[in-house]
Design a protein with these regions (language model features):
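Nuclease and nuclease-like effector domains acting on nucleic acids or nucleotide cofactors
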Residues: 3-81, 90-156
């Protein structure tokens, strides 16, 4: 049984590794303007993220640069990626710090669409008082896939 588990980990690890950002290049960065004390007037206000979201011209340029640098090498076109915030704007991630932005594939079991589900869950939990801002930020920045599996469930 141990051998089967080890084999599964070896086969699955490269796929999961690609879906996680490079921990050195993208450790995540927090927006200092968002704190636990002010979430009611920042992230928990409908439409607040629109006021701080960087323009597509900035994120597209960064995405192309990061893909070209090889940190996120892929045979696919840049249009198949979203330049995503590791710590989402919904939970106080920094909007423009490159340490919080990375090219994430749109599709796949742990693509950008799946991460969006986790971001929405964490945002609702923080704003409802079921989780602190720091807990949500730590969950997603340490390993967003593990957080997804814990909070949303595997294969959902």
């Amino acid at each position: 049984m141990k051998y089967i588990l080890a084999l599964l980990l070896l086969v699955a690890a490269p796929a999961i590794a690609w879906e996680l950002p490079d921990a050195v290049a993208t450790p995540g960065a927090i927006n200092p303007a968002v704190t636990q004390a002010n979430i009611a007037t920042t992230i928990c206000v409908s439409g607040w993220t629109k006021t701080i979201r960087p323009p597509a011209s900035y994120t597209n340029k960064l995405k192309v640069s990061q893909l070209a640098a090889g940190a996120y090498a892929s045979p696919q076109e840049p249009r198949t990626f979203e330049e995503d915030h590791l710590v989402s704007l919904e939970i106080g991630g920094h909007p423009t710090d490159p340490r919080n932005l990375w090219p994430q594939e749109w599709n796949g079991p742990y693509g950008a669409h799946a991460k969006d589900r986790l971001e929405n869950f964490l945002h609702r939990a923080v704003c409802a008082g079921r989780m602190t801002l720091a807990e949500a930020q730590a969950a997603v920045s340490s390993n967003w896939i593990a957080a997804y599996q814990h909070y949303i469930g595997p294969g959902r």
